[in-house]
Amino acid sequence: MIWVAVIITMLLFILVAKPTGIYLEKAFQGSKTLDKVFGPFEKLIFKITGVKAYNQTWKQYALSLVLLNGFMIVVVYFIFRLQGVLPLNPAHIEGMEPTLAFNTAISFMADTNLQHYSGENGLSYLSQLIGITFLMFAAPATTLALVMAFIRGLAGKELGNFFVDFTRALTRVFLPIAFIAALVFVALGVPQTLDGAVTAQTIEGAKQSILRGPVASFVSIKELGNNGGGFFGANSTHPFENPGQMSNILQMMLMMLLPTALPFTYGRMVGNKKQGRILFVSLFMVFLLGFITITTSELNGNPALNGMGIEHVQGSTEGKEVRFGTVFSSLYATVTTAAETGAVNTMHDTLTPIGGLVPLVNMMLNTVYGGVGAGFVNIIMYAIIAVFISGLMVGRTPEFLGKKIEGKEMKLIAVTILFHPLLILGFSALALSTNLGTDAISHSGFHGLTQVVYEYTSSAANNGSGFEGLGDNTPFWNITTGLVMFLGRYFSLITMLAVAASLKEKTVVPETVGTFRTDNSLFGGIFIGTIVIVGALTFFPMLVLGPIAEFLTLK
């Protein structure tokens, strides 16, 4: 029965992808999509803010994005620091320590949601609502806006205006869907209140303080925007965030909704729907491979316990919630790292070595399917590399969407693709070379190495999940992961926007018999091969020293 439920869940991922992709294309191409509802509201926003809907250059678009995001980071930083004297603080929580406030503000603006604090004890309601929830809308709206400009550039059109795209992302996508999802979560038992903690008496006669809050609205945008941060420290393992299997499936659907839709949006906007389908199918195959790998490993149990003769009918159940089971916990772990969300319904630090390898590889690739917007930019980056390599093999100038890929574009892409591993491996080496980093490790040996690399991989990929055995709430970890999140977020977005702007200016080369097609299964295979060879092999030495070595030595 459990496998039937898994198949139905997978089918739901597929069935909602195309309609959502079509809606996104209409929403950002100026077609009528609920204009009577949102049109007046948008016009009012533009009038108040003074936004003029003129087309921007790629530099203007990128500068607008960075300045707005930077302003939000500063405002939210001071909210976190001053929350102790601000209203809506029934638990009388004190202001955040400076480096933790720095880390948290960047984390949520970068759509990472890495949390070095426990949500229910570290933030007031005001900080949760005005700081965290606000950024949970603003961060994915930023990247969804940028990816639309990116696709327009690839299609040879004007990039558009960042502030218009940002507003449309909020009003046409995130606010309405999150509102509906929040109502469903309330119906499924997720609390939504501004009241303080309630005191309950246990069956043993002791008193217990049960924390609650505006959880349903928080969870809806947490998953839809691929944010992932938890209202509670236990994230989606907490019964108030994720009461049962229905809420569990809904959360996974929300996580996958926009990342799986973007290939279809892209296909329609560039006039090549088949290429969009090829990208979707190719990535879904990689996703399935990851799910099968982690599930097989978790169902086989822990080798150390197996050697003691302990039965593992349910597989490796350490760190997992009984109400979800091993299979759905494995699916959730695959989804949350494939869609770069970072929400967890199981503790990733307790996964088997190969089980923990899959989320790690998903984040290292950062392209299956990736988070809202940012992940799709990486998908196209790998697609262009696949075309470039194919062109070199047959001695032709590579072309993508009928435009020649030349030195300028490949230099930008080369720098971008190297920057991700440099962030991860460089900062991991720094942490391992100083006591400031190694003192946080709770496990010696191979697993300790994986803890460190997972933290920086999650930060660079804007995922936010962690091997929580790592004691990361220290100035060293707060500052270094904050820098990695910021650089990992904005560098690739800006460089790839420059690539799209460069391609926009080029004339379309007429298609000939020798043109390498990017809308067939051959390209799909080369695309997957490029992701594996260029992406995965970059990190292979580290994977051998970490989870693979742990797997081979665990008895």
From Swiss-Prot:
| Name of the protein | Potassium-transporting ATPase potassium-binding subunit
Places the protein is found: Cell membrane
Source organism per entry reads: Bacillus cereus (strain ATCC 14579 / DSM 31 / CCUG 7414 / JCM 2152 / NBRC 15305 / NCIMB 9373 / NCTC 2599 / NRRL B-3711)
Q: Membrane-crossing residues?
A: 2-22, 60-80, 130-150, 173-193, 246-266, 278-298, 374-394, 412-432, 483-503, 525-545
Q: Name one GO molecular function term.
A: P-type potassium transmembrane transporter activity
Q: Which InterPro entries match?
A: KdpA
Which Pfam families does the UniProt entry name for this protein? KdpA
Complex formation: The system is composed of three essential subunits: KdpA, KdpB and KdpC.
Tell me how this protein sits in the membrane: Multi-pass membrane protein
